[in-house]
UniProtKB/Swiss-Prot annotation:
GO terms for cellular component: extracellular region; extracellular space; plasma membrane. InterPro entries: EGF-like_dom. GO terms for biological process: ERBB4-ERBB4 signaling pathway. The keyword Secreted applies. Low affinity ligand for the ERBB4 tyrosine kinase receptor. Concomitantly recruits ERBB1 and ERBB2 coreceptors, resulting in ligand-stimulated tyrosine phosphorylation and activation of the ERBB receptors. Does not bind to the ERBB1, ERBB2 and ERBB3 receptors. Disulfide bonds join 9-23, 17-34, 36-45. Proteolytic cleavage close to the plasma membrane on the external face leads to the release of the soluble growth factor form. Extensive glycosylation precedes the proteolytic cleavage. Pfam families: EGF. SMART domains: EGF (SM00181). The cytoplasmic domain may be involved in the regulation of trafficking and proteolytic processing. Regulation of the proteolytic processing involves initial intracellular domain dimerization. ERBB receptor binding is elicited entirely by the EGF-like domain. This is Pro-neuregulin-4, membrane-bound isoform. Glycans are attached at residue 39. Belongs to the neuregulin family. The gene is NRG4.
Length: 115
């Protein structure tokens, strides 16, 4: 059903819309547009629209979202694990350095006492 600003297409655009779509023009816009009949969509009603396909698309979108959430969780977990592992290595390395310094100074102290 056309609005006040829409007019049916003239003979020059007779076959513009496909699959039974109705062609309309808006005088201020140079190109025509289509109002598609049921089960068709697209700029020129060129695509078949199956109601089940929208359900399938929603299902695929949900599956993609779940997969993305799992992937992000795994990445965060791996990052956390690596950071904690790196932190413990750094802490034990510092402890090793402190022990090495203490051992060295104790050894040096003992060697001075022996002379």
């Amino acid at each position: 059903m056309p609005t006040d600003h829409e007019e049916p297409c003239g003979p020059s655009h007779k076959s513009f819309c496909l699959n039974g779509g109705l062609c309309y023009v808006i005088p201020t816009i140079p190109s025509p547009f289509c109002r598609c009949v049921e089960n068709y969509t697209g700029a020129r009603c060129e695509e078949v629209f199956l109601p089940g396909s929208s359900i399938q698309t929603k299902s695929n979108l949900f599956e993609a979202f779940v997969a993305l959430a799992v992937l992000v969780t795994l990445i965060i977990g791996a990052f956390y694990f690596l950071c904690r592992k790196g932190h413990f290595q750094r802490a034990s390395s510092v402890q090793y350095d402190i022990n090495l310094v203490e051992t060295s100074s104790t050894s040096a102290h003992h060697s001075h006492e022996q002379h």
